[in-house]
């Protein structure tokens, strides 16, 4: 555990210690801990380079040569050799980052309407994510946030058209850049349009944020898969499933549903 500095700044006494079978500094948190701001900055040595954390800890001595810790989220695991080819590696890395971002947005969108309706009393008519779309065929149609004074979503073609145009513009800017802004970057375009707060201005912070993004993106993709399975098995939203489980864990859990679930029944 990182030790707290007694003053606003201090220096770390560095010594080699075993960390998951690898030689690491005694404190993996860089000692830039300020008492006033209580800010901890992770050492990027923990996530990048040959001495980074591996997926099996001390049993990860033999990792593929092409997984050298250059990119965020590289724990040395590719048993199927899917990324042995450099072009395939670049493609898979881009797919993972983009799908992770979509999954983070999707997971929030699946939960947030249920939260707003239950505790903020916002009337969505149907807050459950996989049932909401069907409301477009109801008598009252479907309105954004359940408010008829906002954009009316009754026309599926109009919504689809706007979605294609808006997403096409954003993706085009992301890949090709903007006039006068630069050539762009497929995964991390940055700049005033994609990073207006300047969160990635510092290279060390930027490298750390990439790791946080890919880790949370992977977790969100698993979460979305869980939401899909819950929807098929229970017919309920994620928040309702969680509350049911907390209310009666014995009667509401995966094992109970696994014993009585029959696909298509």
UniProtKB/Swiss-Prot annotation:
Ligand binding (chlorophyll b 4): 163, 174
Annotated transit peptide: 1-42
Molecular function as annotated in GO: chlorophyll binding; metal ion binding
GO biological process: photosynthesis, light harvesting in photosystem I; response to light stimulus
GO CC annotations on file: chloroplast thylakoid membrane; photosystem I; photosystem II
Protein topology in the membrane: Multi-pass membrane protein
Residues annotated to bind chlorophyll b 5: 163, 261
Residues reported to bind chlorophyll b 3: 155, 171
Annotated chlorophyll b 2 binding sites: 101, 151
Chain sites annotated for binding chlorophyll a 5: 212, 230
Binding site residues for chlorophyll a 6: 245, 254
Record: residues binding chlorophyll a 4: 216
Residues involved in chlorophyll b 1 binding: 55
Binding positions (chlorophyll a 1): 77, 83, 96, 218
Superkingdom: Eukaryota
Family: Belongs to the light-harvesting chlorophyll a/b-binding (LHC) protein family.
PANTHER family listed in its UniProt record: CHLOROPHYLL A/B BINDING PROTEIN
Protein's name according to its UniProt entry: Chlorophyll a-b binding protein 13, chloroplastic
Organism from which the protein derives: Solanum lycopersicum (Tomato)
């Amino acid at each position: 555990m990182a030790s707290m500095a007694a003053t606003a700044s201090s220096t770390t006494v560095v010594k080699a210690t075993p960390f998951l079978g690898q030689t690491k500094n005694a404190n993996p948190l860089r000692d830039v801990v300020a008492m006033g701001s209580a800010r901890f900055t992770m050492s990027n040595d923990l996530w990048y380079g040959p001495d980074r954390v591996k997926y099996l800890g001390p049993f990860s001595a033999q990792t593929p040569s092409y997984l050298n810790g250059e990119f965020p989220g590289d724990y040395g695991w590719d048993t199927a050799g899917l990324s042995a080819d450099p072009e395939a590696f670049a493609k898979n890395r881009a797919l993972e980052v983009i799908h992770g971002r979509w999954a983070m947005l999707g997971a929030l969108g699946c939960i947030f309407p249920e939260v707003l309706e239950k505790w903020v009393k916002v009337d969505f008519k149907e807050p459950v994510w996989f049932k909401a779309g069907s409301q477009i065929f109801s008598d009252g149609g479907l309105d954004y946030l359940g408010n008829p004074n906002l954009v009316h979503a009754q026309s599926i073609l109009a919504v689809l058209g706007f979605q294609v145009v808006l997403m096409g513009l954003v993706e085009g800017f992301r890949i090709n850049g903007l006039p006068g802004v630069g050539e762009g970057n497929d995964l991390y375009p940055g700049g005033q349009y994609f990073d207006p707060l300047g969160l990635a201005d510092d290279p060390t912070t930027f490298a750390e944020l990439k790791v946080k993004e890919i880790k949370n993106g992977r977790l969100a993709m698993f979460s979305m898969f869980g939401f899909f399975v819950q929807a098929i098995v229970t017919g309920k939203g994620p928040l309702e499933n969680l509350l049911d489980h907390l209310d009666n864990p014995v009667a509401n859990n995966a094992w109970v549903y696994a014993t009585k679930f029959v696909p298509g029944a």
